[in-house]
Curated annotation (Swiss-Prot), chain A:
Induction: By abscisic acid. It comes from Arabidopsis thaliana. Pfam families: PBP (PF01161). Expressed in gametophytes and developing seeds. It is found in: Cytoplasm. CDD domains: PEBP_euk. InterPro entries: PEBP, PEBP-like_sf, PEBP_euk, Phosphatidylethanolamine-bd_CS. GO terms for biological process: abscisic acid-activated signaling pathway; positive regulation of seed germination; response to abscisic acid. Keywords: Abscisic acid signaling pathway, Acetylation, Cytoplasm. Disruption phenotype: No visible phenotype under normal growth conditions, but mutant seeds show hypersensitivity to ABA during seed germination. The modification N-acetylalanine is found at A2. This is Protein MOTHER of FT and TFL1. Gene3D superfamilies: PEBP-like. Belongs to the phosphatidylethanolamine-binding protein family.
Amino acid sequence: MAASVDPLVVGRVIGDVLDMFIPTANMSVYFGPKHITNGCEIKPSTAVNPPKVNISGHSDELYTLVMTDPDAPSPSEPNMREWVHWIVVDIPGGTNPSRGKEILPYMEPRPPVGIHRYILVLFRQNSPVGLMVQQPPSRANFSTRMFAGHFDLGLPVATVYFNAQKEPASRRR
Amino acid sequence: MATSLVFLLLVTLTFSASTLISAKSNATIIESTCKTTNYYKFCVSALKSDPRSPTADTKGLAAIMVGVGMTNATSTATYLAGNLSATVNDAVLKKVLQDCSEKYTLAADSLRLTIQDLDNEAYDYASMHVLAAQDYPNVCRNMFRRVKGLAYPVEIRRREASLRRICGVVSGILDRLVE
């Protein structure tokens, strides 16, 4: 069990953002053709649009997806931890976020300084959440732990994270 | 009499020539700074129309642009709160307009923090604050979208696009400062 979350411990995802959990669901994340595996490097220019996310589970289950950056504005001084990029709730099991309710629209990674971790966290809901959830007042200083606690989401059932840093000027234009 | 006139003419010509030369060299800073953004023409015209730009460095130009954004955001917040929501009888629309006004006020606050960040040369903070300012108008638009049958007013859409463009320019200039 511990082996399957090791990259998350090593990457301090568990600790900085999440508590130790046992993965009980599968989630596959793709930016274009690139499959996201823990700690892989993604160019922000390839992440302008939301990733394709497929989750396991039964259609009568509902899931919440959160994408968050604990390294805002910079990993050495993350005073805006966390910066939340995307929140989708009420995603039916076995489907993808387009079938859920987008509480907070996707914002692409734009790391100004340093290498940031971008974490996608999947929770299994106990009940439909859609009408109860308001958009957070600000993307800064978000707490995935508190959000999960507030809506009784429990521990994550799946998580994956990638790294991104600012691309050199010549590439961005 | 004639010599003093000629002398006056020469002084005037020299003065305007030197002003032209220094104005031209700073026009180059404005142009090269704006080249790093995605809105070159808009960036150049906005900066050139500010009296402080001839003597501003890149950081100063960023601050000028942030000021333009603050004006936009504050005027939109006022427009929504004062003019629009006061004249509306529909309770749902009134609430949306008031919430939207709040979001544009938050955008202006974020931009004010950006100025402080620029003063402190904390460009990573500045980048995040500009991102926040750019995001608040989206929240307003989504509030309209959530209400069935409620149209997103053209005037607000125009102001949203304007603020996004201004923030885009600031982000572009900040990218250059961070490098």
